Amino acid sequence: MFKWLMSSLCGIRNSTSPEVYEPIIGGQNPATMLRLQSALAAVNALLPATLTIEDVISSADNTRRLVKAQTLARTYQACQHNIECLSRHRASSDNPNLNAVVTTHMINAKRLSDTCLAALMHLYLSVGAVDATTDTMVDHAIRMTAENSVVMADVAVLEKTLGLDPQATVRAQDLLALNSGVLNSVNAVAEMTDPTDDVEFTQSVHSPLLPRQLSTTEVVGVPSPVKSNLKSKHKPKRKASLVAV
């Protein structure tokens, strides 16, 4: 109190004032409740056990934890969207440098998303707390610069802290690239073969699947009667001959 009084009399103000959290009363501020519901929806989509507004507003620590968790959840969703967009890239020999850049971005985005998810789980489901490393992760997640080497170095530290295996991500990306290459090869073979050619090849003019069309030069032959080897028991009747008078 005395320090505050002396600083006020001398005109000295503390520029780095600590954050102040006011208690939230449900129904008093609709905008605040809407932001809380939006944050809970983003976080509950990744947590196995859903949180409620009562859990969040019960203490200032829970509110601060929700703010960190919302940033981690938004970053995870953004990384997943980037991975989905980058996976549509078709690797080609025309621009090999672009293929390497896309692969690097996919690996970094996958590592960042896995780290955000693990930090979020550790924030709510672990017994201990890693507030320092989580705060660092949140600061980097806000900047969203996964391609930066400094950020990826901090991600590597968090991976070691949270027990993640980045090599598994690289192997998964290699398997995805292999499956994409096989699918592209199958599609290329399918495009080279025309379905109409297959029909004409399997059902030609002489194919039993189609009726044979006669040309103008062919002569239609009348089938001759087949002589039977069986002898009839009845005697053939003789025709009456005409006698000229």
Swiss-Prot record:
Superkingdom field: Viruses
Tell me the InterPro entries matching this sequence. Herpes_UL51
Q: What is this protein called?
A: Tegument protein UL51 homolog
Where is the protein found, in the record's own terms?
Virion tegument; Host cytoplasm; Host Golgi apparatus
Source species of the chain: Equine herpesvirus 1 (strain Ab4p) (EHV-1)
Q: What is its main location?
A: virion
Please give the subunit comment from the record. Oligomerizes. Interacts with ORF55; this interaction mediates ORF55 incorporation to virions.
Cellular component, GO annotation: host cell Golgi apparatus; viral tegument
Keywords, A to Z, come to: Host cytoplasm, Host Golgi apparatus, Lipoprotein, Palmitate, Phosphoprotein, Virion, Virion tegument
Q: Where is the lipid attached (S-palmitoyl cysteine)?
A: C10
Region spans: Disordered: 225-245
Q: Would I find Phosphoprotein among this entry's keywords?
A: yes
Q: What is the lineage of its organism?
A: Viruses, Duplodnaviria, Heunggongvirae, Peploviricota, Herviviricetes
* Known role: Plays several roles during the time course of infection, including egress of virus particles from the perinuclear space and secondary envelopment of cytoplasmic capsids that bud into specific trans-Golgi network (TGN)-derived membranes.
State the family it belongs to: Belongs to the herpesviridae UL51 family.
| Post-translational changes noted in the entry | Phosphorylated. Palmitoylation is necessary for Golgi localization.
Which Pfam families does the protein's record reference? Herpes_UL51
Q: What residue spans carry the Basic residues bias annotation?
A: 230-245
